[in-house]
């Protein structure tokens, strides 16, 4: 709305407010004039009688020496009064001029008084309009000033974040090495696909909601056969129910097989793990066929994961490919090392003696092996970071740098996650060469296959209400808790209620954690109770229901949690308990996610006041039902990608700006 139209609306409102007042004034004046016409003869007669009485009293007190004069005056006055009284009784056109002049003067005075009142009212209206305009202008100016202040503060924060060293090895920085070309591979897309027009390639991307960014992007390919994937691997995928590539695989696999560095962003359960594991297996197989490795050599490829469970899951997937290639394809047996805490190194000595082709690891155990000279990266040219935003976060930056310092040659670097804020993407690009970004859906968006149900539950009623929620869907069900104590309490409560349940958290041994996950996957147990250690990347295809016993401290953990259901195109339900203990910033982030995913927003979230322009536009446009909006409508937090707060109020940034023990305290056992 323009300033002129807004001012006009304000004037209209004030005029409407003053119209009744002016009407009342005019009605009062008309009433007074009517009364004046009716009362004028009586008032004039009374006035003449009073004057006559006063004159008589005066004449009585005067001495008799003027008797003749007094008598004459009294007679004259009486005669005039009688004439006026008689004149008043006549019709107005027969009244004397003096009486008409008196009435005219009276009416004129009333009209002048009315005009003064109306002028005064108009002045008040104008003053009120000007005052309102001034107040509104002051409010707009204050809002603009506050917006500029926040922008400047956020700019200072971003500048301080950009002072971090690039994500490259010490050797490359010391030698001032800058790679300008990506690694060359022998893989090529089929000729008929390469000969297609770029418009045809973009049409495929648009149909699958694939957004790409980069130079000379390889074409998307919609079948595994056209990607030249070996038949034994395709058979393994068919056994897992994967008949055709998912959107992230359609574009991601050709990019990586071409040797390009890549940032992959897609919702949970979209098949990201396959994108960076399968090319590594094919690359290691090609290198082994060229020149077999011997003791002390290897690996050719490395994948880093944020948790033991995710590393174990990735390791199992890689082994399924290598075993199929060896047994059904007649290819050499590739050896993969799982380097995570809780595994006795003596059990893995036979792998070190023969040489390692690939390593799946968590940073802590990997650094331990490097320090003990068990492995080296002289031949390693392939690095994948799963859940990359976690691995590159402030608390883990030094671990990643220490790993990179052991690389001696150029490598192909891949970063994948469901949540990767813009700031983390920019920081990660310092480790990439001519990267291609492949994005399926907005970074940090929830899986649209998941129905999100958010309920306000008092803390003391949560554990009892949990049993009712378990009845929504058949098993298996996954329950997430923020604290290890809550995991143990819920596990014991479910056992008392005769529910087949298992639990995992960071304090349990590796054997306990692996046996619990195995029993849950095999269907021997109906419920798995876990901390966020089970929320990152773990694949449970049959899960229909995820229950968040409490909200995580960061919204991105919520996205990872609910992503354990609704995988591989299936539908799922996520129930989340909220209460007054949750921070307003976190609840606003949740409110945004629900609106964006077209989910029902509970009254408890609708009542939270906020000045987020993006949320207000979404609500105005879609009636609180969601429905997407351009990212340009507002700026998300550039540190965590949350939309319910700004960078200056980012809870994650404040948390990680504190002592390191704050963020090493939870989940540190996985490192």
Curated annotation (Swiss-Prot):
GO CC aspect terms: spliceosomal complex
All residue ranges annotated as the Helicase ATP-binding domain in the record: 253-438
Location relative to the cell: Nucleus
One Gene Ontology term from the biological process aspect of the record: mRNA splicing, via spliceosome
SMART domains reported for this sequence: DEXDc, HELICc
Ranges of Low complexity composition bias in the record: 33-83, 125-139
Top-rank taxon, per record: Eukaryota
Family according to the record: Belongs to the DEAD box helicase family. DDX41 subfamily.
Chain positions covered by the region annotation Disordered: 33-88, 125-148, 617-636
Zinc finger intervals, CCHC-type: 635-652
Class of this enzyme: hydrolase
Stated name of the protein: Probable ATP-dependent RNA helicase ddx41
Residues that coordinate or bind ATP: 266-273
Pfam family, one: DEAD
Span(s) of short sequence motif DEAD box: 386-389
Species: Dictyostelium discoideum
């Amino acid at each position: 709305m323009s300033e002129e139209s807004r001012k006009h609306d304000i004037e209209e409102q004030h005029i409407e407010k003053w119209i009744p007042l002016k009407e009342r004034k005019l009605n009062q004046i008309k009433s007074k004039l009517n009364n004046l016409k009716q009362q004028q003869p009586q008032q004039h007669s009374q006035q003449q009688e009073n004057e006559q009485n006063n004159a008589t009293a005066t004449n009585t007190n005067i001495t008799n020496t003027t008797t003749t004069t007094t008598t004459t005056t009294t007679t004259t006055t009486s005669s005039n009064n009688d004439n006026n009284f008689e004149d008043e009784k006549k019709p107005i056109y027969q009244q004397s001029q003096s009486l008409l002049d008196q009435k005219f003067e009276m009416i004129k005075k009333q009209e002048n008084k009315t005009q003064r009142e109306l002028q005064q009212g108009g002045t008040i209206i104008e003053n009120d309009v000007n005052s309102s305009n001034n107040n509104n202008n002051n409010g707009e100016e204050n809002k603009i000033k506050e917006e500029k202040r926040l922008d400047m503060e956020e700019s200072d924060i971003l500048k301080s974040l950009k002072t971090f060293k690039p994500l490259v090895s010490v050797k490359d920085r010391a030698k001032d090495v800058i790679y300008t070309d990506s690694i060359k591979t022998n893989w090529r897309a089929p000729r008929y696909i390469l000969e297609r027009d770029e418009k045809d390639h973009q049409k495929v991307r648009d149909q699958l909601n694939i957004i790409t960014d980069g130079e000379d992007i390889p074409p998307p390919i919609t079948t595994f056969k056209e990607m030249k994937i070996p038949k034994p691997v395709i058979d393994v995928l068919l056994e897992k129910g994967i008949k055709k590539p998912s959107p992230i695989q359609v574009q991601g696999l050709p990019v990586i097989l071409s040797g390009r560095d890549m940032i992959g962003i897609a919702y949970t359960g979209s098949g990201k793990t396959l994108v960076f594991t399968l090319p590594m297996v094919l690359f290691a197989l090609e290198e082994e066929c060229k020149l077999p490795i011997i003791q002390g050599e290897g690996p050719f490829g490395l994948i880093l994961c944020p948790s033991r469970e995710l590393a174990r899951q990735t390791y199992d997937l890689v082994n399924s490919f290598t075993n199929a290639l060896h047994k059904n394809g007649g290819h050499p047996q590739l050896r993969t090392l799982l380097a995570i805490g809780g595994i006795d190194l003596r059990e893995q000595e036979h792998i070190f003696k023969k040489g390692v082709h690939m390593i799946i690891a968590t940073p802590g155990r990997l650094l331990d092996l490097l320090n003990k000279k068990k492995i080296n990266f002289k031949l390693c040219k392939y690095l994948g970071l799963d859940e990359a935003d976690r691995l590159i976060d402030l608390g883990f930056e030094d671990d990643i740098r220490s790993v990179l310092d052991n690389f001696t040659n150029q490598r192909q670097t891949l970063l994948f996650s469901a949540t990767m804020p813009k700031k983390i993407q920019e920081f990660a690009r310092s480790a990439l060469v001519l990267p291609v970004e492949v994005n399926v859906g907005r970074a940090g968006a929830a899986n649209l296959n998941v129905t999100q149900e958010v309920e306000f539950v008092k803390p003391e009623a949560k554990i009892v209400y949990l049993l009712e929620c378990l009845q929504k869907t058949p098993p298996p069900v996954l329950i997430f808790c923020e604290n290890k104590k809550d995991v143990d309490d819920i596990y014991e409560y479910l056992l008392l209620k005769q529910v087949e349940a298992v639990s995992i958290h960071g304090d349990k041994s590796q054997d306990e954690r692996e046996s619990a996950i195995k029993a849950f996957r095999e269907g021997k147990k109906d419920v798995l109770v876990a901390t966020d250690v089970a929320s990152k990347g773990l694949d449970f295809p049959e899960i229909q229901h995820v229950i968040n016993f409490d909200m995580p401290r960061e919204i991105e953990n919520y996205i990872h949690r609910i992503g354990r259901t609704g995988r591989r195109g299936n539908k799922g339900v996520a129930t989340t308990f909220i209460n007054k203990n949750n921070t307003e910033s976190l609840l606003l982030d949740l409110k945004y996610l629900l609106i964006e995913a077209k989910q029902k927003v509970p009254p408890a979230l609708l009542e939270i006041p906020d000045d987020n322009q993006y949320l207000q536009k979404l609500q105005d446009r879609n009636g609180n039902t969601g429905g997407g909006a351009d990212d340009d409508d507002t700026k998300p937090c550039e540190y965590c990608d949350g939309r319910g707060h700004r960078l200056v109020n980012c809870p994650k940034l404040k948390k990680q700006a504190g002592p390191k023990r704050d963020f090493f305290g939870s989940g540190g056992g996985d490192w």
